[in-house]
Amino acid sequence: MKEFFPSIVRRTVRFKVNPVRDLALSGATSFDWKSTGDHPLFDLEPEERGETVPSGWVYVEARMMRRGAHLVARLYIDTGAGFSDAESIVIPATRAGNIKQIIKIPRDTRRLRLSPMRSEGIVRLDFLRITEISGVERIFRMMEWVAGDIIKFRSTDRAKKYNITWGRMLTDLKGAYEDCAKLRFHSAPLDYESYVRKFDTLRQSEIDSIRRHMSSFAKRPLISILIPVCRVSISYLKSAVQSVFGQIYAEWELCLAVDKDDGPETASYLKSLSEDDSRIKVVFLSAGGSVSAASNSALGAAAGEYVVILDKNDVLSSAALYFVVAKINEADGLNIIYSDADEIDGDGVRSNVCFNSSWNPDLFFSCDNISRSATYRTSLVRELGGFRAEYEGGQDYDLALRCVKRSVSSQICHIPRVLRHFRRRGEPDSADSSVGNNAWMAKRRALSKFFSDQPGVSVSQGELPGTYRVRYPIPTPAPKVTVIIPTRDGGPLLKKCMHSIFNRTAYDNFEVIVVDNQSEKRETVDFLQSLSKRSNVAVLRYDFPFNYSSINNFAEKHASGKILCFLNDDVEAVEPGWLSEMVSHALRPDIGAVGAKLLYGDGFVQHAGVVMGIGGFASHAHRLYPATHPGYAGRARLVQNFSAVTGACLVMRRDVFHAVDGFDEDNLPVAFNDVDLCLRVREAGYRVLWTPYAVLHHYESYSRGDDQMSPEKRARFNREKNFMLYRWKTDLLNDPYYNQNLTLDREDFTIADFPKLYEPWRV
């Protein structure tokens, strides 16, 4: 077939690239580029003088390696009206950077541009060529690709979701080929507008099903919606009120407290509402200027079992109260219920969605991600004294913190649906009480008050605006840490690792146990001998086949520290506070394991927490993002909880390690043992924590592969993977620290093409 194609190919055009914007050469060759902004662009110029741009059906081939946050390539086409997103084509790529894609370029195309990514990062473009092909070749190439994917993905859920089948290949080849492109790693994610249209717009049949489901509710609590009306835009207030009237669940009341300084138009509107509907309660305040006072007055009028605090500018989805009451019926004793949220503009266009995780205490201590979408048990709010004026501007966060303090984790519930639409920042009158430095200071004081019963805890500005860093104390004298490092012929990497421990670590009370697993190279053997002469280093010999779990369990038996630090020999500390930061969290009684922020040698993220379910198994959050990138909703720069962290740098108390029986050396000798350990730590009732304030380099290769190079390794890898699937059901697990609306195909927190929607009416 490949010999046949050249005879029917018309021509191939090879292109060179010229930077247009946000690009600079990063090396001595013309292949390596640095993206300096969010929209890097190359002009594509034919290498041969006089060549015209290919058109019609073409075959695009390239090799383009990228590191950054949003790695979707797009080809822009100018047919005479200039370049625009409307005339552009997504060019999918494999994880390795290979591009082989059939597209159709209009006949009147004059120029081409390439956007390699949509973020800062690095790009290596080895070559790019476009070949005009005949209709026959197009069909054969499409069939060849689809058939290959049918065989490769035949037993996967992804192939089923996209309907990649033999039958579809025969009846809808073009559609099947386009969907096969979505199976490639760097393909275009679902945009939020499409998500809203496909998955977040209720059809009449679904509304009918919701009504039938509500008729079966054992609990039908009255929900009191509180709106403090201060300095209001009457049009936005009307939108907020209308969103309450539009609720599918009808057992609600609306309690509004009106600032005395709001104008007569607002007073007249609300007065007429209350006269027309007994569910509307309006309190007119004699004083003005305090959102806390208005909120308390609205709370005083509430008769509901639960209260919803609705900002005067915000909008509820029509099913918001239904989802809340569905959760109340699913679980007893809920105190706090919160949801996902997005932003809405004056035209009703929604954007900037934030899909929250389930209850994530340490993320909540890093940023207020739930109070504006929260529902509370009314009796608890009243028992706590309602809203406190001394935290004006941060009163909602203060209330949420006090409710959290009086609740256990099972009483805090997340609904993975977009139930709140916040007024888009920058819209007229959209500023709310949580914005601004005064609000941040009020929230910081509220957070400090939350920790006031824990001596030594301090709260300061986080790495991102509007966020917080909570520091936990280390007692004096500091507990001893045992750093455990397995190695086999680690050589220069081990030297770099040890040098950083001794010369770039501010924590003083530690010992190092290096486990030599049959090193043979003279450089490593000599270095280990020199290490053994240090008073706080022990070199242990492990003369058995490599078993990561067994090696670490063996070393732990020789440890004398209260704290264990499991460290790979290819890891290097970047800044001196890394171990102190990790130990300070590991000493917290509710924290069972602590992970660090690991960067590849070139500074891009290797590990920022482990998300279960990605790729049907697990993967590292924000992998390949720039080190300083905030990540999704700031999560690459915030202390938070994850289901697991990597064992390449993992700190935990020794008593926790014993409580979960250490690493599983029988079933997981090489792979997945760190994930399994963390999942057992969580199963034992502890939280796993990741901190961005402990930064180390991990010199693991980008192209490490899947550990299946030989038949023996392949068989062992499959045994370990199957064991994890059996023990933890990782292919079915909804990671509580992720969100089921987000993709399981990549590590970039983009929206899933087929989200696992929370639809309680279907249960």
Functional labels for PLM-detected ranges:
Residues 241-251, 330, 499-509:
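Short, acidic, metal-binding catalytic loop of nucleotide-sugar glycosyltransferases
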Residues 221-226, 253, 398, 479-484, ...:
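Cell-envelope/extracellular polymer assembly enzymes that use nucleotide-activated donors
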Residues 380, 390-418, 578-582, 636-661, ...:
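A short, conserved alpha-helix in the catalytic core of glycosyltransferases
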Residues 307, 564:
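Short aromatic/hydrophobic "clamp" motif used to bind/position activated sugar donors
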Residues 285-302, 542-559:
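Glycine-rich, basic loop-to-helix element that forms the pyrophosphate-binding segment
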